[in-house]
UniProtKB/Swiss-Prot annotation:
Coiled coil: none
Family per record: Belongs to the FBPase class 3 family.
Annotated source species: Streptococcus uberis (strain ATCC BAA-854 / 0140J)
Reaction catalysed by this enzyme: beta-D-fructose 1,6-bisphosphate + H2O = beta-D-fructose 6-phosphate + phosphate
Domain of life: Bacteria
Keyword field: Carbohydrate metabolism, Hydrolase, Manganese
Pfam family, one: FBPase_2
Protein name: Fructose-1,6-bisphosphatase class 3
Necessary cofactors: Mn(2+)
GO biological process assignments: gluconeogenesis
Enzyme class at the top of the EC tree: hydrolase
Gene3D superfamilies linked: 3.60.21.10
One Gene Ontology molecular-function label: fructose 1,6-bisphosphate 1-phosphatase activity
């Protein structure tokens, strides 16, 4: 401890420097807490996600109305458009107004933006706001923001700054800088509760956007974990992400943006597979050429077969996973082209019998082994993909505890009686929090050793994708094989873990919270399963202890949910859950045709505004203040 205070004294070599820091930290502790945003199941839907960030899930419009009560709705809407999409709005207005009239309009609205920055930034220190300013305009912006009531002399000073900005044709850029500053000030901390990846085309764009946030945490989803697994050396995870990309016409992500060449795999698929209707890509309203559809069809067939071969190998070498029910090749009657699962025999459709060596059905050919090794090399040497997975590892985990909220993506595996379901690995049984901690440890260990491809830690990725006691999956089994090769849909059924019924019960939720060291005032924030709001399901369950925030941001789920996602907002006044309408286009926003907010629900309101000192970060600041104060009073001892 003595060494700690000696090092602290090196940082603060005088009592006056200690005093300054204590006063600064104490002042921060008495500010209102920053606004936290919780989103889940982004599924690669970049434009809709980006729009939510730009408008802070409707909070910016609400604050504009508070800041400018005298303005009519038309003025508020125009300000919103300028703040959400400043560059696009300026370009659109230039077409309509011409350059001179545009400059006049920007000059008219710029004071409003400056006033609104002061309004939204009022609960932050000047230092924090200063750090958000873009380097090119930091001095100008700080000068324009500094004085609350500039005197007559300062008025001319400000006018001179603006006149020079206009003269140098920089008003557009300054305007954009203020709009983007408002966006940054509106979201203090972002929580992403899983599944950045899935059927949407632009998870890479989402990850680039997330990397720009100073305060962010991520809870891995089941789709995210397979991408991490691919980079960590799992052949089956790698093939799975290619298969899903082919299924949803997202191959451009892998080939063009991550720079991973799939040519040899495509040639393999074209030489061995003919078109099968069940493997046609799911297009979500898109139109593609027949030749492109054929490529995706054949590619999906090839990756599916490779996946099932690799899965059989994994199940055999990991009996502790308890996945023997997935050994389906042995249940196939090749003569009658049927499969028997349980007591029922089903005819097989579109199954590639001619591609199988029935003496060694899960064995890979030399061609297939070479393909997999080449693909793994290209995946692991994709610079951008590696950066994105590094980010997921750095900011992510199986769960996160923040300010009395427990965040996890999928479920807490349970028995029907409410006991935590356990899994035995080695000689140790894991359940509850210990199970999630164990999974996370294995993921991190595997990520450190990407040259290992069939070790226990690497195989855990596949268990997390589809294992019965995986907290990311939450079902008894995954029926991918059956969905492709068996027409009878009764074979496609996947039974959810009892958790999904039990989470309606407050007592169960309190038991989960207690497992993670939280009290009965805490909340669980959960994603993964879309809330069927149009069918009457509610996202707030168990007397407010459980909040489900997967509302169908992905287009494919919106027919089921009736909405397009949720944002949970935690500010100094309490908790609010916002449901969204589907996002249409940037053009519709600029024309005032898209207001994404659908329903707002107040989850919880606090009697007194929550201050920074009452948050997790605040507790760290109070500890720091106590240490500084001790050093201040014992300065000469160190």
């Amino acid at each position: 401890m003595s060494q700690y205070f000696s090092l602290l004294k090196e940082k603060f070599p005088t009592k006056s420097s200690l005093l300054t820091e204590m006063i600064n930290l104490d002042a921060i502790c008495h500010l209102p807490k920053g606004t936290e945003y919780f989103l889940s199941d982004l599924h690669g839907e970049y434009q809709a996600f980006d729009y939510l960030l730009r408008n802070a899930s409707g909070s910016i419009k609400k604050k504009l109305q508070e800041c400018f009560p005298e303005k009519d709705s038309e003025d508020i809407d125009k300000l919103c458009q300028y703040i959400y999409y400043p560059s696009e709005k300026i370009a659109a207005q230039q077409e309509i107004l011409g350059e001179k009239a545009l400059q006049e309009e920007l000059s008219f609205y710029l004071p409003d933006l400056i006033q609104f920055v002061k309004y939204t930034g009022s609960k932050y220190t000047r230092s924090k706001v200063r750090k958000m300013l873009p380097a090119d305009y930091a001095y100008i912006m700080e000068e324009l923001l500094t004085e609350e009531q500039p005197d007559k002399n300062k008025h001319f000073y400000y006018q001179a700054i603006l006149a020079k900005v206009i003269e140098l044709e920089q008003l557009d850029n300054l305007f954009v800088a203020f709009a983007q500053l408002i966006q940054k000030l509106s979201i203090d901390h972002l929580h992403i509760v899983g599944d950045i990846f899935d059927r949407g085309k632009y998870p890479d764009f989402i990850l680039e956007r997330l990397r720009s946030f100073r305060n962010i945490d991520i809870q891995w989803g089941n789709h995210d974990i397979t991408w991490i697994g691919a980079i960590s050396g799992s052949y089956i995870c790698m093939i799975n992400v290619i298969r899903i990309a082919a299924r949803y016409n997202s191959i451009d992500l892998i080939e063009d943006r991550y720079g991973i060449n799939l040519r040899r795999l495509i040639e393999y698929s074209q030489s061995h597979f003919q078109e099968e209707d069940v493997f046609n890509p799911i297009l979500d309203g898109e139109e593609i050429a027949d030749s492109e559809r054929m490529v995706l069809n054949q590619l999906q067939q090839a990756t599916a077969l490779l996946q099932f071969k690799l899965e059989h190998q994994l199940i055999k070498r990991r009996p502790c996973f308890g996945m023997e029910a997935g050994l389906l090749f042995s249940k196939i009657d090749t003569e009658n082209q049927t499969i028997t699962i349980g007591d029922i025999t089903y005819p097989l459709q579109s199954f590639p019998f001619e591609m199988m060596d029935w003496d060694n059905p899960d064995g890979l050919t030399e061609e297939e082994e070479a393909l997999l090794k080449g693909l793994m090399y290209r995946f692991q040497n994709s610079t951008l993909l590696k950066e994105h997975v590094d980010f997921l590892i750095e900011k992510g985990g199986m769960y996160h505890i923040s300010n009395n909220h427990l965040l996890f993506h999928g479920c807490m595996p349970m028995h029907s009686n409410g006991d935590f379901k356990s899994m035995v690995f080695g000689k140790q049984a894991y359940s509850g929090r210990a199970l999630l901690d164990f999974f996370e440890e294995q993921v991190l260990e595997s990520y450190k050793n990407p040259d290992s491809h069939e070790d226990f830690q690497t195989d855990i990725f596949w268990y997390l994708w589809c294992g019965e006691v995986s907290s990311l999956f939450g079902k008894d089994r995954m029926t991918t094989f059956e969905r492709y090769y068996i027409a009878d849909k009764t074979s496609h059924v996947e039974h959810k873990n009892p958790y999904y019924k039990l989470r309606e019960n407050e007592e169960i939720c309190l038991r989960i919270l207690e497992e993670f060291g939280l009290d009965k005032s805490a909340h669980i924030v959960n994603g993964h399963t879309p809330v069927k709001e149009k069918g009457g399901e509610l996202p707030i369950k168990a007397n407010g202890r459980m909040i489900i925030i997967d509302g169908g941001l992905a287009k494919g789920y919106q027919k089921t949910t009736g909405i397009a996602g949720y944002t949970l907002i935690s500010n100094s006044y309490g908790l609010e859950l916002v449901a969204h309408k589907p996002f249409s286009s940037v053009q519709d926003v600029l024309e005032g045709k898209c207001d994404i907010i659908f329903i707002k629900r107040l989850v919880e309101i606090v009697e007194n505004r929550t201050l920074v000192k009452e948050t997790d970060n605040g507790q760290l600041l109070l500890k720091e203040i106590a240490d500084l104060e001790y050093l201040y009073h014992h300065f000469d001892q160190f």
